[in-house]
């Protein structure tokens, strides 16, 4: 039984045991493009990946399943070398603690996503990045593009082109790196991890 066959079983909930860790060769491989029209298996896998992210962000389900909270997941992280990513970025509460009008600033499963253009300006998260496949802290600025235009297909086989900036752009670039065999710490300057290039946007 392949990893995907196990993951898409109706009763299976993706948990931390399904997520492979650094050192596994799947994380360093360039993943294969999915074929269209999408197979039921690839659609279900995308839905399961999104379900995992929602569970991971839910305090009750997250604790029950022992999950680390995540805003993105790529198929290679669950040992399926396909170009599928799921992104779920929640909107914050307002200053008075009220829930946002829209729960998420981005909620999408992207098939065969690719960056088709990007800004000259770079950006990095002030606190660095983490990864569900990396069980250690690696400090430093992860240098990425401040703005990107991404093309992808959705589960209905429809093509989209979206422009992203800020945190959403960072998250999508992190996940696209996964399908290209790249891990976030590859983009940290090992000798000067917190060196900010001139004009680089630091996102708090």
UniProtKB/Swiss-Prot annotation:
Cofactor-binding details, from the entry: Binds 1 Fe(2+) ion.
Broad enzyme group: hydrolase
Chain sites annotated for binding Fe cation: 131, 174, 178
GO biological process, one term: translation
Matching Pfam families: Pep_deformylase (PF01327)
InterPro entries named among the record's database cross-references: Peptide_deformylase, Peptide_deformylase_sf
Listed GO MF terms: metal ion binding; peptide deformylase activity
Keyword Hydrolase recorded: yes
Cofactors that this protein relies on: Fe(2+)
Protein purpose: Removes the formyl group from the N-terminal Met of newly synthesized proteins. Requires at least a dipeptide for an efficient rate of reaction. N-terminal L-methionine is a prerequisite for activity but the enzyme has broad specificity at other positions.
Family: Belongs to the polypeptide deformylase family.
NCBIfam families attached to this UniProt entry: pept_deformyl (TIGR00079)
Protein name (record): Peptide deformylase
Organism: Streptococcus equi subsp. zooepidemicus (strain H70)
């Amino acid at each position: 039984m392949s990893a995907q066959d196990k993951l898409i079983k109706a009763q299976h909930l993706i948990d931390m045991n399904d997520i492979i860790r650094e050192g596994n060769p799947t994380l360093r491989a360039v993943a294969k493009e999915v074929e269209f029209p999408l197979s039921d298996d690839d659609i279900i896998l995308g839905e399961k990946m999104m379900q995992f992210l929602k569970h991971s962000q839910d305090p009750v389900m997250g604790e029950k399943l022992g999950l680390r909270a995540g805003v993105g997941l790529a198929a290679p992280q669950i040992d399926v070398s396909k170009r599928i990513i799921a992104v779920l970025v929640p909107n914050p509460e307002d200053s008075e603690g009220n829930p946002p009008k829209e729960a998420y600033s981005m909620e999408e499963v992207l098939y065969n996503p690719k960056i088709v253009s990007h800004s000259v300006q770079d950006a990095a998260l002030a606190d660095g990045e983490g990864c569900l496949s990396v069980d250690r802290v690696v400090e430093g600025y992860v240098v990425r593009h401040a703005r990107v235009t991404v093309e992808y297909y959705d589960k209905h086989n429809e093509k989209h082109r979206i422009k992203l900036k800020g945190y959403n752009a960072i998250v999508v670039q992190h996940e696209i790196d996964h399908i290209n065999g790249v891990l976030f710490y590859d983009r940290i300057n090992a000798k000067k991890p917190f060196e900010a290039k001139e004009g680089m946007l630091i996102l708090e």
